[in-house]
Amino acid sequence: MFRLLSWSLGRGFLRAAGRRCRGCSARLLPGLAGGPGPEVQVPPSRVAPHGRGPGLLPLLAALAWFSRPAAAEEEEQQGADGAAAEDGADEAEAEIIQLLKRAKLSIMKDEPEEAELILHDALRLAYQTDNKKAITYTYDLMANLAFIRGQLENAEQLFKATMSYLLGGGMKQEDNAIIEISLKLASIYAAQNRQEFAVAGYEFCISTLEEKIEREKELAEDIMSVEEKANTHLLLGMCLDACARYLLFSKQPSQAQRMYEKALQISEEIQGERHPQTIVLMSDLATTLDAQGRFDEAYIYMQRASDLARQINHPELHMVLSNLAAVLMHRERYTQAKEIYQEALKQAKLKKDEISVQHIREELAELSKKSRPLTNSVKL
């Protein structure tokens, strides 16, 4: 009936990716740093099986790129690129950098096989020269690539290898980069129905960030910038959103509602009510209320989300409108629901979103069945 929208946090954390709620069986979550030692044997790639459940891969694709690679955070903090350039990096390091740039370009061009081959070359050269930063960064890129391709077992091993290197290099377990990897691992475990690990992963991410935020809230700006604090809050919002998604698909809408409420509050405070991802969270919160039969409350949030989506010409406007129509249908406002579905269909066609077009047409057919008996009874 509904399509959930994923949100992108500040600094491009997460690309929007809609997924359909009805019939989804995905369970979403991280083992912590343990796992493969540094010199991991990278498994051969395997194409993801088609039967993992509707809507799973769009979610994985969204999560996989919700931030820059975690290793990039470490690299940026220590000024690795700048230092290497100033010191006159040797030929091997320069070659690794070029390989990584080529790999990222291939990923952007949707050429995953080519990217994988290039990354293997970069990793081999990084090991030959014992360049630990390059090894870590390459593992992280390989993990993200495997993740978006649905190669969950490969991605798990590679994310753990990345985490092992980061922790071995002195990064703390509460660092945002570690939390980001943990969240990705969590989604892998959830998709594999490894529920104990999944739940533990979400709890680790959320509790660690909440404790971190509490400790850092009084720090002066010269010690920790406003932007750094905001990024940690936004990452918490991401974790709450992912956990809420897991709870909703696990048939726990009331618990999901509480998570979405917290995530929405964070997004409103930091990004504002008109931010595209704040609107996404309003829509998803409405979905959890609707799932509990609280149709009037759901309508309030969904109506507000759709109004804002129209004002800013939201890229997922057609999906928000489709969700609004679904709430109206549950409230037995069939005429209004039909009008909104038709508007959503028009927007979906303009976006050339064939999946949404098909979904909306199915909903219109279902609406027609529901409203026909009412029309007939009126005639009688």
Curated annotation (Swiss-Prot):
Organelle transit peptide: 1-70
Gene3D superfamilies: Tetratricopeptide repeat domain
An example Gene Ontology biological process: mitochondrial respiratory chain complex III assembly
Physiological role: Required for the preservation of the structural and functional integrity of mitochondrial respiratory complex III by allowing the physiological turnover of the Rieske protein UQCRFS1. Involved in the clearance of UQCRFS1 N-terminal fragments, which are produced upon incorporation of UQCRFS1 into the complex III and whose presence is detrimental for its catalytic activity.
Transit peptide keyword on record: yes
Family listed: Belongs to the TTC19 family.
UniProt name for this protein: Tetratricopeptide repeat protein 19, mitochondrial
Site positions per UniProt: Cleavage: 71-72
Post-translational modification: Proteolytically cleaved by PARL.
Disease: Mitochondrial complex III deficiency, nuclear type 2: A disorder of the mitochondrial respiratory chain resulting in a highly variable phenotype depending on which tissues are affected. Clinical features include mitochondrial encephalopathy, psychomotor retardation, ataxia, severe failure to thrive, liver dysfunction, renal tubulopathy, muscle weakness and exercise intolerance.
One GO CC term, this protein: centrosome
TPR repeats: 136-169, 179-212, 237-270, 279-312, 318-351
Compartments in which it is found: Mitochondrion inner membrane
Entry keyword Phosphoprotein: no
Self-association and partners: Binds to the mature mitochondrial complex III dimer, after the incorporation of the Rieske protein UQCRFS1. Interacts with UQCRC1 and UQCRFS1. Interacts with ZFYVE26 and CHMP4B.
SMART domains tied to this protein: TPR
The organism of origin for this protein: Homo sapiens (Human)
Keyword tags: Cell cycle, Cell division, Electron transport, Membrane, Mitochondrion, Mitochondrion inner membrane, Primary mitochondrial disease, Repeat, Respiratory chain, TPR repeat, Transit peptide, Transport
Main location: mitochondrion
